[in-house]
Amino acid sequence: MSDNNQCVIVGIAGASASGKSLIASTIYNELRAKVGDHQIGVITEDCYYNDQSHLSMEERVKTNYDHPSALDHDLLCEHLEKLVRGEAVEVPEYSYTEHTRTSNTTTMTPKKVIILEGILLLTDPRLRDLMHATVFMDTPLDICLLRRVKRDVEERGRTMESVLKQYQQTVRPMFMQFIEPSKQYADIIVPRGGKNRIAIDVLKAHIAKLLKA
């Protein structure tokens, strides 16, 4: 864990569609009143997928997005270190339909609390070292698959066939190889998804304690 007490960084990992975004947004909304609207922020690991603008669409589609090599953790670590030092950063914007970054970025200023959420956060020791608390969403894979199909078809313009094919070829195998083993690095393991009220309250209390340290 980082020794810096001016910025509390919380990492929320787990399978795709396990409830990471839901629990992150819930904690964000419920803590804003206590720490201030401008003192808490959420960073999604997906924003740090590699820039693939130099590749054709055919090549982009073939990328294994569930492997650590698909993500620019170097840039994510650099941004977190800058935020801890009190510097603003430009968070990339990623397009799920174009399978690459857009030309847009979002400015993030230093915060008292930064919530990270992403499937592979706990696989990288550099990221783990920057986090003050780590969470793993331990949601059954069959439930994750149902949620993923619904989300990707309705929100990301994909076909059910392509979602199921990707799940069989990369999502599940990479979960077993990388994501599931990273659960050992979690301080808190959350069953039953992002609506687990007890887990949310425990995590909020822990963040409040870290802020007072």
Swiss-Prot record:
Domain of life: Bacteria
Record-level GO cellular component terms: cytoplasm
The family this protein is said to belong to: Belongs to the uridine kinase family.
Gene from which this protein is expressed: udk
Recorded catalytic activity of this chain's protein: uridine + ATP = UMP + ADP + H(+); cytidine + ATP = CMP + ADP + H(+)
Enzyme class, spelled out: transferase
Main location: cytoplasm
Pathway info: Pyrimidine metabolism; CTP biosynthesis via salvage pathway; CTP from cytidine: step 1/3; Pyrimidine metabolism; UMP biosynthesis via salvage pathway; UMP from uridine: step 1/1
Subcellular localization: Cytoplasm
Protein name in UniProt: Uridine kinase
Binding locations of ATP: G14, A15, S16, A17, S18, G19, K20, S21
Entry keyword annotation includes Magnesium: no
EC assignment: 2.7.1.48
GO biological process: CTP salvage; UMP salvage
Origin species: Vibrio parahaemolyticus serotype O3:K6 (strain RIMD 2210633)
GO MF annotation, one: ATP binding
InterPro entries membership: P-loop_NTPase, PRK/URK, Uridine_kinase, Uridine_kinase-like
NCBIfam families: PRK05480.1 (NF004018), udk (TIGR00235)
Record keywords, A-Z: ATP-binding, Cytoplasm, Kinase, Nucleotide-binding, Transferase
